[in-house]
């Protein structure tokens, strides 16, 4: 069974662990850089991207994650953290050649749920202060999902990033299955 790490310093950690179990993988909560050893993939969860970024700097995660050669899934704040820029000064991994519009849909009260397409399937997406891709910076970035023309899912190399929270909907498992099939098991 594949071991999927979930960055466990802030955000929706338990919900991601439950989803990883549903796709017959072993979740491993990542609290220190040493916990990165032995994982087959990494999930960077939603939460507050500035807080997660500062904690990643404090705990020494930035360079360690940048040097990983494994698939990475970023959800919501995870998408923000993987990006090249947000227009705001904050720690970023800068691994995904996109810029991000933070909180593109507005504040917490503007959060919503909507059906969108991902990998040829319809998924009930939960958008909570969700980002959108502002600009794609290289030709190897592929669009995975859109919401009314706005880019909310991309992939580049071994990285998948989505602006919604798959861990919060019953059929969100579709996103994890897509990640598993197209990234983790793609050898």
UniProtKB/Swiss-Prot annotation:
Q: List the disulfide bonds.
A: none
Q: Which UniProt keywords apply?
A: Glutamine amidotransferase, Hydrolase, Lyase, Pyridoxal phosphate
Q: Which reactions are catalysed by this chain?
A: aldehydo-D-ribose 5-phosphate + D-glyceraldehyde 3-phosphate + L-glutamine = pyridoxal 5'-phosphate + L-glutamate + phosphate + 3 H2O + H(+); L-glutamine + H2O = L-glutamate + NH4(+)
Where along the chain is L-glutamine bound? 47-49, 102, 128-129
Q: Name one GO molecular function term.
A: pyridoxal 5'-phosphate synthase (glutamine hydrolysing) activity
- The region annotated as signal peptide is none
Quaternary context = In the presence of PdxS, forms a dodecamer of heterodimers. Only shows activity in the heterodimer.
**Name of the protein in question:** Pyridoxal 5'-phosphate synthase subunit PdxT
The gene it comes from is pdxT
């Amino acid at each position: 069974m594949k071991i999927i790490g979930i960055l466990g310093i802030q955000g929706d950690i338990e919900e991601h662990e439950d989803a990883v179990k549903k796709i017959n993988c072993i979740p491993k909560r990542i609290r220190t850089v040493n916990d990165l050893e032995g994982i087959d993939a990494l999930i960077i969860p939603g939460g507050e991207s500035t807080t997660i970024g500062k904690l990643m700097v404090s705990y020494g995660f930035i360079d360690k994650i940048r040097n990983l050669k494994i698939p990475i899934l970023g959800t919501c704040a995870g998408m923000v953290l993987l990006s090249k820029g947000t227009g705001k000064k904050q720690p970023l991994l800068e691994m995904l050649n996109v810029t991000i519009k933070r909180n593109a849909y507005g504040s917490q009260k503007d959060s919503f749920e909507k059906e969108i397409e991902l990998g040829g399937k319809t998924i009930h997406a939960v958008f909570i202060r969700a980002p959108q891709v502002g600009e794609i910076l290289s030709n190897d970035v592929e669009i995975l999902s859109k919401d009314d023309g706005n880019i909310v899912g991309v992939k580049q190399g071994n990285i998948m990033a989505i602006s919604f929270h798959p861990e919060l909907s019953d059929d969100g498992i579709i996103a994890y299955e897509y990640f598993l099939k197209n990234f983790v098991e793609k050898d």
